[in-house]
């Protein structure tokens, strides 16, 4: 049955094939583009096996700071002539000793209250 359908199809008429002649005047010596094969154009085997080094950032020109003198964001005062210190050494010692004494007194007070809280907590848990 399928063969009947194939026989009913019309025959297609194509135009005759165009014949293109091959170029017989072609020179293989250099008339076209070719890859150079001489040893001058080949990559040396040492370069082919090892990758090139990674690119590096160019270094800035040498400055006095890079020669050993490091610059800081904040410049240190070389002389105290800009500011006069009008604080006595005894005042400074009294200030720090008073702060130290206050912290010691407050730490012992908190230690006693913590101990009292623990005692009261333990007595409640025993009942």
From Swiss-Prot:
Keyword annotations: Cell cycle, Nucleus, Protein kinase inhibitor
Annotated region (Disordered), positions in chain: 21-71
Signal peptide extent: none
InterPro entries: SMR
Principal location class: nucleus
Organs and tissues of expression: Expressed in the shoot apical meristem, leaf primordia and the elongation zone of the root.
GO cellular component: nucleus
Subcellular location: Nucleus
PANTHER family: CYCLIN-DEPENDENT PROTEIN KINASE INHIBITOR SIM, CYCLIN-DEPENDENT PROTEIN KINASE INHIBITOR SMR13
Note: Plants over-expressing SIM are dwarf with serrated leaves containing enlarged cells with increased levels of nuclear DNA.
Function noted in UniProt: Cyclin-dependent protein kinase (CDK) inhibitor that functions as a repressor of mitosis in the endoreduplication cell cycle. Inhibits the kinase activity of CYCD3-1/CDKA-1, CYCD2-1/CDKA-1 and CYCB1-1/CDKB1-1 complexes in a dose dependent manner. Cooperates with SMR1 and SMR2 to promote endoreplication during leaf development. Required for normal trichome endoreplicating cell cycles. Positive regulator of effector-triggered immunity (ETI).
Protein name: Cyclin-dependent protein kinase inhibitor SIM
